[in-house]
């Protein structure tokens, strides 16, 4: 599959090997015997899977098509997380499968998707991280497939995902909040976002996360919370909660916003790679202030869905996109934050 020494593999031999692998159901057999093999042999199996999956004939991926018609292979790769000795090996195989839209769809619509809270919560740190990474890839790498899936299976998926958001494990909670924030501000997930931020129970959960002792969890929760506030068509229940808690939220946010620049830089180093510290801080404050300003809801939505990758430039935060306000000083920021919540009157 990889050639011998420095020589390239012979295409005819690779094709013959692949055909025999399909005919003999070798992929299923290798996953079955993997727990009984030595460490180096497991690594060899991973290389075989990766090579087969990457093999192409023109625009076709024969092995991807084969796995699509033999879903037990994907199921076995997922359930490798049940066996600690091979979990990271099968995790690599699953990761390679999820690079292809067809198999990502097979993964999302599989009942085995709902085993992932167990894999993330009850396994070792390395296995938990690997399982979460594969779940994240499935939701983010193929946006149209994921959006269609979430629209069709919203209730079942978020019933599962709430388990991760409510986890007692710091890493699980932080990464789950971060992924949720990424999903909600992605244009492909607009319908899911509207449905999520219309539910008052979701708002309560995120507001509780804002009170977490961890500043990093507070930060990730804030990125989700501001989507609730920015929604121009809040449900009565959501608006009522924001109205009742307006004073406490404003007090919290006035102290929360100014000192988050350094934390954001540590969490997302690429954000500051092309901007000065002063410019970055101003951008964060502008984004936060406008995303909380109910009187600028549509400007805020423009900001969210055009800047999801934080690619901020002076043009993208002009008065055209954000109303009449320009770079705010501290007083201006406080005034904008103060207008964040619905009036209590």
Kindly label every feature range from the protein language model.
Residues 1-118, 132-151, 189-195, 202-205, ...:
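Alpha-helical solenoid scaffolds in large eukaryotic transport, assembly, and signaling factors
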Residues 37, 82, 123, 164, ...:
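Structural signature of alpha-solenoid helical repeat scaffolds
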Residues 45, 276-284, 293-305:
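Intrinsically disordered, low-complexity terminal segments enriched in Ser/Thr
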Residues 123-124, 129-170, 174:
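Active-site cradle of extracellular carbohydrate-active enzymes
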Residues 162-234:
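Long, repeat-rich segments with strong aromatic
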Residues 277, 281-282, 335-345:
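Eukaryotic intrinsically disordered, low-complexity regulatory tails and linkers enriched
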